[in-house]
Design a protein with these regions (language model features):
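Compositionally biased terminal segments of proteins
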Residues: 1-169
Length: 169
């Protein structure tokens, strides 16, 4: 039952990502922990992973999620992934398997993908522009994240402009 789930920890994230990598799952980390991977720390209680909406992806994801303490993923039917709806796995902590995030899919967001090294663990996530595309709801936390992401993108663009007008030729 979801109300008995504890917040996901950084160690939970690392264990999950390690398993996703070992199972060769096509995934993109999104949500609060993706922001964390980019250096923005805010409270989050779950792990959000965007994956392709295919049965093959479902098989790999289910196998990868079997590292979770309560093995709640054993009840996942890989055929559900063809339906395109998001899947909430309420284990010791919550993992949201996203097939759609604000109208964006794995296919539409993979162009924004990048790999972040977190303590030697390679995590596939999306850049700030991609994250901004997943934060287009009216939820308070998404509006706050959107403001931070928009400002961060402005700063990066200003840095690029100053580099372009710098020394050298």
């Amino acid at each position: 039952m979801e109300e008995y789930c504890r917040p996901a920890t950084l160690e939970d994230l690392k264990a999950l990502i390690t398993s996703l990598n070992q199972q060769e799952v096509d995934y993109l980390l999104i949500g609060g922990y993706a922001l964390f991977a980019h250096g923005y720390h805010r409270a989050t209680t779950d792990i959000d992973v965007l994956v392709p909406a295919t049965e093959e992806s479902g098989r790999k994801v289910r196998k990868a999620l079997m590292v979770l303490p309560d093995q709640a993923a054993k009840d996942i039917d890989p055929a559900w992934f063809n339906e395109g709806g998001n899947i909430r796995v309420a284990d010791a902590f919550v993992v949201d398997i996203m097939l759609n995030a604000c109208g964006e899919t794995y296919e539409t967001l993979k162009q924004y993908s990048e790999t972040v090294d977190m303590d030697g663990l390679l995590i596939r996530t999306i850049n700030l522009e991609g994250l901004l595309r997943t934060k287009q709801t009216m939820r308070d936390k998404d509006m706050a994240d959107r403001a931070v992401l928009e400002r961060a993108l402005e700063v990066l663009q200003e840095r690029e402009k100053s580099r372009d007008h710098g020394f050298g030729g």
